[in-house]
Amino acid sequence: MNKPEIFNKAAHPGASASTGAPYGRNYELNVKLPEQVLVAVEETAAELESLRKAQLIKLSRPVLTIARFQAREEMEATLLRWINRILGSQSGFRFAFNNYGSMPGTPLYWRIQDAEPFRKLTDSFRVLEGWLLGNGCKGLELFSHPRLHLLDEVDGSIEREVLLAFSASTYYEVVELMELQLLARECWEDEYRLVSRFSLLPEGFKQTSFDQ
């Protein structure tokens, strides 16, 4: 695999590969979730709607993220080619959401039962780390054990009540991962936009050559 080019950083004073200066677009690489999962997220949000109106919680975006990073606009074409080459040898796989979880800083989420396939998938993206840093961008943030966050924030006055309510709840859904979606937003924007979709090979299919 050829090493991607280093882009000229002269127009961005203060950029440094060693410090990972935070500028450029914010990118996310997310799993395309099936409709039944998105509906289940909406149903969970509906249960929490009264609390949200009271500003006691902040709902999460319904995404399953495996990578985050920053890159400049002029890097995007090379970035897309690079991701296409990485995923060109990756097969899709099945995984299961398995009940609710909670931990400090992550009030409520759906757990993934076996994250090993995600570890292998995210490891394949580590090759991008040097390219991003070499272009003066922040490093790559990979999520080898991703979670589907349901709440970003919960007020301390109701945190115990919310967690107890969902501790008795169950959720189980098997999902086939066949597509990843690259989203981006400018640093001054709140909403992400879809940049590109990447299809994975059929489950169990192995491509014999990376370069054609």
Question: Where does each model-flagged region fall?
Answer:
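A short, structured active-site edge motif that brings together acidic residues
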Residues: 94-101
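Short, basic/glycine-rich phosphate-binding loops at helix/coil junctions
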Residues: 101-108
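Short hydrophobic/aromatic beta-strand or adjacent loop that forms the aromatic wall/cage
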Residues: 28, 107, 179
